[in-house]
Structure formats: structure tokens, C-alpha cells
Amino acid sequence: KVFFIATANNLNTIPTPLLDRMELIEVEGYLTEEKKEIARRHLIPKEQKELDFGKYGTLKLTPAATELIIEKYTRESGVRQLEKQIDKIFRKTAYLTAVNNEMPFAKSTIKPQDIETLLGKPPYNRDKYQGNTYAGVVTGLAWTAVGGEILFIETSLSKSKASKLTLTGNLGDVMKESAVLALEYIKSHAEKLNLDYRIFDNWDIHIHVPEGATPKDGPSAGITIATSLASALTQRKVRANIAMTGEITLRGKVLPVGGIKEKILAAKRAGITDIVMSEENRKDIEEIKATYIDGLKFHFVDNVEEVFEIALLDEI
């Protein structure tokens, strides 16, 4: 009898017949603080042992420098890229020391301002909340193979004789279905939003999710799409610093979604202060350490009408 242990970053690439025969154990990605601790205890000491700077002493990285590498030079749930970047820093420093016959950094310590010299311009810019003054733009929370991310749902209207729904942004089938479902819900509850039903016959609706080169799918953007539609159709703007995640049903019920821990951290990184999610996700929040949710206000809802009440401002 042979026992196989396999690892994968993305289950979507595994053939279904093979996946059905596997026992799945999902391992959560590391938090930024956990990555910093792994770097401090393991990755940096490993490089220090391999590269001896002799009379110049032991090369060190400040915690702030390590965090900068994690945030702007890696995008992963693990620490593989982080290890490569730290290795690159040590090798580049060794080269500069050998060429110039002196340590290029004071007290053999690398600070945040030194990182760009060693690694070049940062390839990633961690998501930040984009305060907007436009109706129809809503911030959502997504979970990906590299951790939590924030995304923006944009809805615009254009005058037309024959109304149609256009979806762009490299959306998968499930996300497209969520958009259709959200629109149908709003149509059937137009009176509650003080909408003239004829608006659906005279205007084209365009829903877009930026960063079109990145594929997006899943049901968790349901309430975000519904709120974006409601905002655009009523011209009511969305509250500042609010994000949301949750699946929506045709009856307007908000269902729980996964990846809550990662989404919460993405929201906090982006400067979000208020998060809307399903009441059934309350238990997930209770399992997260208090330090990670400090400064965040959670709004737990059962139906999408509650989402509109929380997220949409009264003034136009």
C-alpha cells in the first residue's frame, strides 16, 4: 500500500477524476505578520549562514524592510517569493561589498529606503481603497490563490432604445450569473428602490470589474454587484471606506462565502473600516484574532435590502 501526499496552489488545474479520489486538507496562507516572523527566524538566518561578510559583520534587515518586501515585491500565500527576494538582497549586497571594498549600508543594516536599490522598482502595489464620488462604484472583497484582494465593481448606464446588459473584466461564468441574478432581483424590487420600471427598457447597463487581464470568478461578488447596480440606477453614492462580500439569491438572501480571514486582512491593508457580509459568516469572524480585526466594524446581514440600507447614502 502506497500513501501519496501532494500539494497544489490551485485546485482548478487538477483533473476532476483525480480530485475526487483525494482527501483535501486546506491550509490557509500566511498573514503578513507571520511572514515577517518566518523571515526573522528562518529565512534571514539561513542567508546569514551562507554568506559571511567578514569584518563588516552580519547583514541584517529591519522589520520595516522585510514588510516592504512582502507587500510590494511578492504576491503569494506562502513565502517562496519572499525567500528568493531575501536571497537576492544578500547576493547583491555581497557583490557591492566586494566591488567597492566596503559595506554599502550603515551598520550592515538594510532599511526600507535601501530595498529599491537592491531589488529595483516594486512590481506590486498593494490595494488601497479608492475614495470615489461616482454612483455605481462599489468595493468588494475577493479571495485568490495568493490571498485576499479588494476589487471594484463599476456600473454605468447609457441611453438606448433596446436595453441590454454588458459584462466586462474577464469574468467567469459564475460571476456572470451573479450579475444577471442581481439585476433580476433589482428589477423585481424596483418599487422599493423608488425606480420607474421603464428605466430597464430605455437604458443599457454595463458592469465592469477593472484589471481585465486578471480572470475573476465565483459567487462572492453577488452583493457587491447588486449594490453597484442599485447605486447606478438610483444615483445614490456609496458610503466611504466600506467593502462587502457575499453571495446573493434570487430572493435577495445573502449567503455565506469562504476566505473570510484573507479578505479581512486585504480590507485592513486597503484602509477599509466597514465590512458587510452574511450573518452566517459571523462565526468566521469570531475565530479570527482580535489584533487582526481591530479597527474594523462588521455589518452582518440576512438580505440584500439590509446591504443597501447600510451602503447607500440618501443624498444623490
Spell out what each predicted region is.
Residues 9-12, 280-282:
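Short, polar loop motifs at secondary-structure junctions
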